[in-house]
């Protein structure tokens, strides 16, 4: 900050106020599970191959639409061992909502598919509206409720929580780490994806 002062912030009052508002029926509690029952089948039924690739990145890495709508070759950072699953993954560097930046880890198969595409094209770019429409039609064919591409982030959060738990992280640490991977700050945000 401009005054060179150390400041600490505690936003926990927000959750307390929200909980109390819900108890008093001032806020509708209409959160529902937006994860797809079979996200792989949903992706299989997508008509556009670029949409399939974008959806795989969202499902495997938890990226938002901003992270997959436009990807350039310089965003591909190679591979590394995922310390949680001990599986080698491809690294895509993304900038998403609020300017938050970071790594998105995807399977080597998905990473190589993206890398191959970018070796023949200047950029990976999808039209968001066409992507949403493709997902909507695929959900219909797959007998799923359409939750747009954000539903794939829900699937990511649930799977990643399980992976952290298998790696002997505490519940609170699982929440926090998944929150960071999804480019959130507060651990409590992850709870919304676990409904």
Question: What are the functions of these language-model segments?
Answer:
Residues 48, 57-71, 163-164, 182-184:
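A short, glycine-centered helix-capping/turn motif at helix boundaries
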Residues 70-113:
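Conserved tyrosine-mediated DNA breakage-rejoining catalytic core shared by Y-recombinases
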Residues 34-65, 175:
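Basic, Lys/Arg- and aromatic-enriched nucleic-acid-binding interface segment
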Residues 153-188:
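C-terminal catalytic core of tyrosine-transesterase DNA break-rejoin enzymes
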Residues 1-5, 106:
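Non-catalytic DNA-binding core/recognition domains of DNA-processing enzymes
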Residues 105-162:
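Active-site/catalytic core of tyrosine-dependent DNA strand-transfer enzymes
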Residues 188-195:
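Major-groove recognition helix of helix-turn-helix-like DNA-binding domains
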Residues 14-40, 46-48:
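A short mid-domain helix/strand-loop element embedded in enzyme catalytic domains
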């Amino acid at each position: 900050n401009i005054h060179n002062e150390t400041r600490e912030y505690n936003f926990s009052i927000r959750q307390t106020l929200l909980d109390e508002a819900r108890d008093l029926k001032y806020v509708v509690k209409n959160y529902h599970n937006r994860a797809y029952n079979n996200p792989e089948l949903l992706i299989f039924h997508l008509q556009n191959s670029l949409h399939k690739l974008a959806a795989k990145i969202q499902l495997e890495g938890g990226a938002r639409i901003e992270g997959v709508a436009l990807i350039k070759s310089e965003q591909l950072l190679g591979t590394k061992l995922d310390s949680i699953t001990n599986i080698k993954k491809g690294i895509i560097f993304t900038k998403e909502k609020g300017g938050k930046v970071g790594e998105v880890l995807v399977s080597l198969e998905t990473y190589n598919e993206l890398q191959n595409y970018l070796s023949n094209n200047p950029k990976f770019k999808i039209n968001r509206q066409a992507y949403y429409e493709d997902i909507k039609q695929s959900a219909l064919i797959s007998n799923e409720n359409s939750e747009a591409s954000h539903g794939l982030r829900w699937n990511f959060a649930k799977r990643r929580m399980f992976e952290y738990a298998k790696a002997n992280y505490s519940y609170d640490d699982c929440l926090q780490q998944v929150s960071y991977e999804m480019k959130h700050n507060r651990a409590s945000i992850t709870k919304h994806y676990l409904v």
